[in-house]
Structure formats: C-alpha cells, structure tokens
C-alpha cells in the first residue's frame, strides 16, 4: 500500500509518499515484524525469534509509538526519546504479564522520525535503533545510487567488533 502524507513544519510543508511491506519469509511460520509508516515516525520492530511473544513484542512497540504522535506535524527529539522509552516499558510489561521468568518478550526497533527543535525550526530526520535492526538511506548523489547504512548495531557482536 502506498500512502501520501502532508506535514506542516516550520515555515512550510512537506509531502511524503510512503510504502511499506513485511513478509514472514521462508523459514518461520509467524511474522515477528511490525512496522509503523505514519508521520512523524517510520520504523520497524523485529520481534526476537526463539523467544515467546516475539510477534506481540514488536506489535506492542509499534502500537506504543503510534499512540504518541500527531501525524500532521513533526515531533521534538525529546518526545521521540520518551516514546521509545514508553515502547520499551510496554514490551517489558508483556514479560511481567506472562508471569513466568522463563518467558522473555523482546524486539528490536529501528527507524527515523521527522523532528524539529522548536516550532519555527527546519525539520530534520532523527535516526534511532535498538538492537541489531539497521537503518539505511538511499543515496542518489553517488554515481551509482546505493544504500548507505546510517545506524550502528546495538548488540554484543558490534561491541566485540568495536573493541
């Protein structure tokens, strides 16, 4: 599905054309991905496979983000960080709700948000990621357009690579 969004920001307006899709793949029976593609947030949550509630964890994180924002205006960076914390708290509540210490609900979260520092500021993109899901940008300024990674994995493997 392709959608168009009009956003009033600062001294002007921005029109975004957005498309999103998720697929279970060839190995798993349950799609543990959830996504939000509605201004000001565009993100994917990848439920942790092998853990109970991976699909619920990703859906919970995305729903928490969806409930935080007005889709017609950018948000502030601080509000985005608060929304991520609330999404994390909602996922942690799933684990508590299960009532079993062996049940762990978890998800990665990666995306971008359209943010402004103050109402008259020019909006810009804020990149965020938790876990090993990545954020890329499509670079059309290169001789051959290419995907360029803009996030750094938040994982033990990345810590070992950085050491």
Predicted feature descriptions by range:
Residues 1-163:
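PP2C/PPM-type serine/threonine phosphatase catalytic domain
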């Amino acid at each position: 599905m392709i959608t168009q969004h009009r956003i009033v920001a600062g001294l002007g307006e921005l029109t975004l054309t957005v498309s999103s899709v998720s697929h279970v793949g060839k190995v798993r029976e349950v799609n543990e991905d959830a996504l939000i593609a509605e201004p000001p947030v565009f993100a994917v949550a990848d439920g942790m496979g092998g853990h109970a509630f991976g699909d619920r964890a990703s859906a919970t994180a995305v729903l928490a983000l969806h409930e935080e924002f007005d889709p017609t205006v950018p948000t502030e960076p601080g509000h985005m960080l608060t929304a991520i914390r609330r999404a994390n708290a909602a996922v942690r509540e799933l684990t508590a709700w299960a009532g079993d210490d062996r049940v762990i609900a978890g998800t990665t979260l990666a995306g971008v948000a359209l943010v402004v520092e103050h109402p008259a500021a020019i909006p810009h993109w804020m990149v965020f990621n938790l876990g090993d899901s990545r954020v890329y940008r499509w670079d059309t300024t290169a001789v051959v357009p290419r995907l360029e990674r803009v996030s750094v994995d938040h994982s033990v493997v990345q810590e070992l690579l950085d050491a």
